[in-house]
Each structure stands twice: as C-alpha cells, then as structure tokens.
C-alpha cells in the first residue's frame, strides 16, 4: 500500500511540475485493452499540433496516469500542455469486447482547458477504440475521439479525430506508442504523438 501511495504522489508531482515546464490537445495513446487490475500506468508523450492554413506547428507534451480498477475497467487522469494552453481531464474506459485477436473499448470523461488570454472551456470526452495484435508484442489500434466543449461566456464547439496508432511492448513493464490524430472538422487540429508508457506493477 505504501508503494502505491508513493507512486500516486510521484505521478501527481509530475503533472504539477509539467505545468511549470511547458505551456493541450488530448491524445488517445493506448490500445483497446484496459490497464491490468491493480496496476498503475504513467505515460509521457511529446506531441506536435500541426499548423492549419499555413500556420506554424506547435510542440507540447501530453501525459496519462491510470489505474486498473477491474479486469475490464480503468480510470486515467490526463493532462497536456502547449504554448498558451493547458488541458486537464480524466476518463473511465470499459473493455467491452475481448476477442481472440480483436478488442474494443469505449471511454467517457471530462476536461477543462485553460487558454492564455481567455476563452477557457470545459467539455465531455468520448472515445471508441479497437485493436488487434498482428505479431507478438505489437498492437495496431484505431479510434474515434470526440470532445464536446463549452466556452466560458461563449459558444460551443466539437473536436473530432480519427486516430490510428501502434503500441509495442518493449519489456514487461514498458510500452512504446505512436499515433496520428486526423482532424475531422474545422475546429480540430491534426496531431502526432509518440512516447512511452510505464507499468509499475505489471
């Protein structure tokens, strides 16, 4: 129990420190399989938001810190930081289809977004994911990621992405992930993300 508490505190300190270091676009960065029951995961993902209409691309960092509640349900805190933008949220994922070589899950959550200069928003996140394992240690996944945002003292908008990605098991407790988020509407920006996820108790 003490070890779990220390790990949770370490994850919280990481997310707090990241605010000071990087000034977010949510990322998927996981297959349809949930975190093993009782395990903890910390993922750090450098992310680029691709510029639109000739605009500059912007680098930032996204992070996820999660816990496996049951054999089919996990919960994750998520954060992302870009210049002038901070994003904090959480979601619950349910692994509803467990096939021999095909899995599917759905996630529901919420977030707040802090924009420098105004325009802060909050919203609901929905994601549907599917994955398969073509070879040992490698998973291919794809997802539909939606965010329904409401701007403080303003209007509403929706972010929508189709997200193909890969998850490669480097070792028993470390995964490498990479994905591209393809924007589906004018409100969204396409992105690329790559990084590592560490499982403390796998």
Q: What is the predicted role of each segment?
A:
Residues 1-34:
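Cleavable N-terminal export/targeting peptides
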């Amino acid at each position: 129990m003490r070890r779990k508490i220390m790990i949770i505190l370490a994850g919280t300190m990481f997310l707090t420190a990241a605010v000071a270091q990087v000034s977010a676009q949510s990322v998927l960065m996981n297959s349809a399989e949930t975190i093993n029951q009782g395990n903890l995961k910390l993922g750090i993902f450098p992310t680029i938001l691709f510029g639109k209409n000739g605009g500059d691309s912007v680098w930032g960092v996204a992070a996820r810190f999660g816990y496996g509640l049951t054999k089919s349900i996990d919960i994750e805190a998520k954060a992302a930081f870009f210049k002038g933008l901070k994003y904090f949220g959480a979601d619950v994922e349910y692994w509803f289809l467990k096939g021999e070589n095909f899995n599917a899950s759905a996630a529901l959550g919420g977030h707040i977004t802090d924009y420098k200069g105004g325009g802060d928003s909050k919203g609901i996140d929905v994601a549907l994911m599917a994955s398969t394992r073509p070879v040992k240690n490698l998973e291919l996944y794809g997802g539909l990621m939606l965010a329904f945002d409401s701007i403080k003292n303003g209007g509403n908008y929706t972010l929508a992405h189709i997200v193909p990605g890969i998850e490669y098991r480097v070792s028993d407790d470390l995964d490498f992930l990479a994905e591209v988020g393809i924007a589906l509407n004018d409100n969204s920006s396409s992105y690329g993300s790559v990084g590592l996820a560490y499982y403390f108790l796998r």
